[in-house]
Amino acid sequence: MDKELIDVDTEQTISCLTLTLYHPNHQDQKLFRGINFSRKEEIKADAVVAFGRDYNVCRYPLLSNRVSRIQFNLQLFKHFNCSTSTFEIKNLSKKNKLYVDNLELDYLNKIELPKKCMIRFGDFQILAEIDEGDSDEKFEICCEKSHVSLVQDSFIPTMQPIPECGTLNAVEIDENEC
């Protein structure tokens, strides 16, 4: 009985990155041909996972002429003095900017992925959702395909005009009336 309690306490959870992919031409069978959808794939914790057009280099090939040979990569990491793992994303395309939510990443720029974010480049949209874990051995990636656009207005910052005089409607005033 005591051994069972010890095993339960020391069992590690695996970080899982769920990626929901969308492209306007999603019905084109070859576009996502190299990706196994709706199946979790276990990956060694020290692996760098590449996305791009090059089928020989990229674990997740995106077969479109508008995608760079290697578009971006994802890597698992842990912050100093933290037990849970998370992911970072690095733009490896010299010709395409990569957007994480509304943050623009140029070539070789990298950032930590938020727990839920939108990754965009070209016509591709990828909703990334992280379930953090503490395993030092492996992580999982699960890809899903969306048939509808993932970009919502909530990802686009909107600025509301602020009226100077407290009225919400524009009022014309003749210069001579002041």
Swiss-Prot record:
Q: Where in the cell is it found?
A: Cytoplasm
Disulphide connectivity of cysteines: none
Q: Which InterPro entries match?
A: FHA_dom, SMAD_FHA_dom_sf, TIFA
Cross-referenced Pfam families, in alphabetical order? FHA (PF00498)
An example of a Gene Ontology cellular component annotation for this protein is: cytoplasm
Residue ranges occupied by any FHA domain in the UniProt entry: 49-105
- Mind listing the GO molecular function terms for this protein? zf-TRAF domain binding
Q: Which domain of life is it from?
A: Eukaryota
Q: Which keywords does this Swiss-Prot/TrEMBL entry list?
A: Cytoplasm, Immunity, Innate immunity
Q: Name one GO biological process term.
A: cytoplasmic pattern recognition receptor signaling pathway
- List the expressing tissues: Highly expressed in spleen and moderately expressed in ovary.
State the oligomer form and interacting partners.
Interacts with traf6.
Which family, according to UniProt? Belongs to the TIFA family.
* Function summary: Adapter molecule that plays a key role in the activation of pro-inflammatory NF-kappa-B signaling following detection of bacterial pathogen-associated molecular pattern metabolites (PAMPs). Promotes activation of an innate immune response by inducing the oligomerization and polyubiquitination of TRAF6, which leads to the activation of TAK1 and IKK through a proteasome-independent mechanism.
How is this protein named in the record?
TRAF-interacting protein with FHA domain-containing protein A
Q: Which organism is it from?
A: Xenopus laevis
Taxonomic lineage: Eukaryota, Metazoa, Chordata, Craniata, Vertebrata
GN (gene name): tifa
